[in-house]
Amino acid sequence: MPPTFSHLMIKVKRIGWLTQVAMKKNNLEQLSQLAFDAQKNSHSPYSNFRVGAAVLTPSGETFSGCNVESAAFPLGQCAEATAIGNMVTQGQKRISHIVIASPNDEFCFPCGGCRQKIAEFAPDETPVTMESQ
């Protein structure tokens, strides 16, 4: 049975909202930069809320994504879902770290759907880092 929404909430509370567990500082900076770079490609004409995300796999590969809005709300896609989709498309199935880049000075927490996606591809100890401008 796949992990549930509450499973991820427990995990996020346990490791803290901001963490650098098991990552060297420069590696976290590189992953954060990928998330902010992806954010620049956001298609968000309705909310103007540009989000980027980047995932790191156990093999060291990185994948990024941005949010893509649609006039047919709620058919848009979150940055986390795009990054995870890119990862899966390339044959990877595990996340060892994920960074979510906010477009302003507040943290952008994953929505319920993205929390579920993260939980399905990430072990309990996976850090979820939120970055702000």
Could you say what each language-model-derived stretch is?
Residues 48-57:
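Short beta-strand scaffold segments in enzyme catalytic cores
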Residues 64-133:
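Zn2+-dependent cytidine deaminase-like catalytic core
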